[in-house]
């Protein structure tokens, strides 16, 4: 569902950029969740279609980020078109391991796993490009909306959530403990997915990274293999219950009184 929202939002951002007219062009940089894995950032490529070319550049955290080459690429693209849209993961790093967002400020807050709180990647890059090239820039951070936009939920996602929940109840009823239900893809075409029960201690704080072969040689875009893998996950729609034009959420009076 997050990928569906991100792909949709990217398409709308690109469409909006058509309305922007500046003498030296405009560069919009969209920051997307992803500390070490670029699945969500790569999903911006889902905006591609007969009515949209998709973002001009996509940068994932799996590959080192070269600030100078980035600037040169933007300068080159501005020779070809007046509006550039770039997708970047919040966790992109330079070759020495420095987060790009750290280039503009220091990060002191860490979570329970010792992870630094990442924010400001798009803002830093927008300022850098504005200073180097002198064009108009926009920094867009999707932030919480990426995981909260339930009005754009994928039906496949919802059905698999039920599938995982059912498998978890079955495993618990059979006496399993300290376990976690995971999804396992069985086929791509037609798309089919099953469940497995795994030891949670072997999964917690682990990550599945985007394969290098699913990113182009220059490290500036995802391949068709990536798109083919992700696209089945965003299929189908779920219509929320609407009240006075706004989606209605499940709630309890007690819950509301403590907020």
Annotate the PLM regions.
Residues 1-138:
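Accessory alpha-helical/coil subdomains and C-terminal extensions
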Residues 102-259:
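C-terminal non-catalytic interaction/assembly regions of soluble proteins
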């Amino acid at each position: 569902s997050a990928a569906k929202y991100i792909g949709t939002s990217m398409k709308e951002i690109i469409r909006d950029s058509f309305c922007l007219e500046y003498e030296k062009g405009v560069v919009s940089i969209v920051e997307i969740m992803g500390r070490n894995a670029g699945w969500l950032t790569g999903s911006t490529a889902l905006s591609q279609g007969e009515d949209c070319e998709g973002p001009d550049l996509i940068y994932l955290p799996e590959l080192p980020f070269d600030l100078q080459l980035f600037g040169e690429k933007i300068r080159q693209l501005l020779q070809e078109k007046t509006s550039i849209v770039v997708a970047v993961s919040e966790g992109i790093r330079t070759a020495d391991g420095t987060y790009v967002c750290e280039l503009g400020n220091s990060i002191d807050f860490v979570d329970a796993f010792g992870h630094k709180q990442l924010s400001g990647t798009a803002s830093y890059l927008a300022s850098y490009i504005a200073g180097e090239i002198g064009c108009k820039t926009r920094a867009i951070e999707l932030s919480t909306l990426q995981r909260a936009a339930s009005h754009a939920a994928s039906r496949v996602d919802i059905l698999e959530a039920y599938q995982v929940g059912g498998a978890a109840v079955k495993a618990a009823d059979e006496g399993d403990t300290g376990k976690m239900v995971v999804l396992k893809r069985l086929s791509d075409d037609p798309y089919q997915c099953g469940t497995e029960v795994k030891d949670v201690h072997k999964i917690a704080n682990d990550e599945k990274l985007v394969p290098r072969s699913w990113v182009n040689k220059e490290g500036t875009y995802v391949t068709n293999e990536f798109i083919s893998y992700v696209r089945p996950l965003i299929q189908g729609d779920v219509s929320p219950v609407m009240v006075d034009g706004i989606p209605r959420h499940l709630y309890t009076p007690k819950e509301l009184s403590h907020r």
